[in-house]
């Protein structure tokens, strides 16, 4: 027959087992309630020396205090950026990103975790991860960030040339782009034998100025100077008539993966100028 002490001992053990089981169930229900949330990134490119955006969105959560945003970069030990409890937490930020990052704090509650990166450097290129925790769950997504230099070209009539000539200039490109001329009238024509392109290294010894000259230009025609590398494609158009010159330019950021959204901008500016009286175009 069991003694009173043994009965008490086994009773306590039973209670402990029951409590442990209850705690395990509570934890289990808590974990099961936190599901994976959708996090979406958009591949993008940064222009050296300017500010860039690494785009990331997630399922909105009205509980700002529960939202944690972490940006990480492959090959970097420290964090790129962290936002938690409604403010930046930069104690573990890697040195290479100090003073250069920020999230859009007023837009976090609506699901915007995009990162602003100041003064983009070549070394900022790489694979980034946007990691999100909310009261609804957690999730992450990677993005490829390319860095280089790109700028809008401008095409002008070269009044100093001895023949009918167009001059296309763009101040900053990297890596070295290709330059191709095209004509609306002579579609498909190869202008490589009547054009000359040069690249001049800028003062920071990274980016280069692009200058391309097209000879034997004819009147009442639209010419396009197309500059392209693996990051961006820019086009400068010029239309020369008997009475005026019209210009247009646009630039689009390219993406190595067509399935992802293209980060781009399109700017058009027309300039209407009187044709020089001494410019004689055939």
Swiss-Prot record:
Glycans are attached at residue 216. Residues 1-24 form the signal peptide. Overexpressed in breast, ovarian, endometrial, renal cell (RCC) and non-small-cell lung cancers (NSCLC). Expressed on activated T- and B-cells, monocytes and dendritic cells, but not expressed in most normal tissues (at protein level). Widely expressed, including in kidney, liver, lung, ovary, placenta, spleen and testis. It comes from the Eukaryota. Pfam families: C2-set_3, V-set. GO terms for cellular component: external side of plasma membrane. Residues 281-282 are cytoplasmic. Coiled coil: none annotated. The keyword Disulfide bond applies. Its main location: membrane. It is found in: Cell membrane. GO terms for molecular function: signaling receptor binding. May serve as a predictive marker for renal cell carcinoma. Negatively regulates T-cell-mediated immune response by inhibiting T-cell activation, proliferation, cytokine production and development of cytotoxicity. When expressed on the cell surface of tumor macrophages, plays an important role, together with regulatory T-cells (Treg), in the suppression of tumor-associated antigen-specific T-cell immunity. Involved in promoting epithelial cell transformation. Belongs to the immunoglobulin superfamily. BTN/MOG family. This is V-set domain-containing T-cell activation inhibitor 1.
């Amino acid at each position: 027959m069991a003694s009173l002490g043994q009965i008490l001992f086994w009773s306590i053990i039973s209670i402990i087992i029951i409590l442990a089981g209850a705690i395990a169930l509570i934890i289990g229900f808590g974990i099961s309630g936190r599901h994976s949330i959708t996090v979406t990134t958009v591949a993008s490119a940064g222009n050296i020396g300017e500010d860039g955006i690494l785009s990331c969105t997630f399922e909105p959560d009205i509980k700002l205090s529960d939202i944690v945003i972490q940006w990480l970069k492959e090959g970097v030990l420290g964090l790129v950026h962290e936002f938690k409890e409604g403010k930046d937490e930069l104690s573990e930020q890697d040195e290479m990103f100090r003073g250069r990052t920020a999230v859009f704090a007023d837009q976090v509650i609506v699901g915007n975790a995009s990162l602003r990166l100041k003064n983009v450097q070549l070394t900022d290129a790489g694979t980034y991860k946007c990691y999100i925790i909310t009261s609804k769950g957690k999730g992450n997504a990677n993005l490829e960030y390319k860095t280089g230099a790109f700028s809008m070209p401008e095409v002008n009539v070269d009044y100093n040339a001895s023949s009918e000539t167009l001059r296309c200039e763009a101040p900053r490109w990297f890596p070295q782009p290709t330059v191709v001329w095209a004509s609306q009238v002579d579609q498909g024509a190869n202008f490589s034998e009547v054009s000359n392109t040069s690249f001049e290294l800028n003062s920071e010894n990274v980016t280069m100025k692009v200058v391309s000259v097209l000879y034997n230009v004819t009147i009442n025609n639209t010419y396009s100077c197309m500059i392209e590398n693996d990051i961006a494609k820019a086009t400068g158009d010029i239309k020369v008539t008997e009475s005026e010159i019209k210009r247009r330019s646009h630039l689009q950021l390219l993406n190595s993966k067509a399935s992802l959204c293209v980060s781009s901008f399109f700017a058009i500016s027309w300039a209407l100028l009187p044709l020089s009286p001494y410019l004689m175009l055939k």
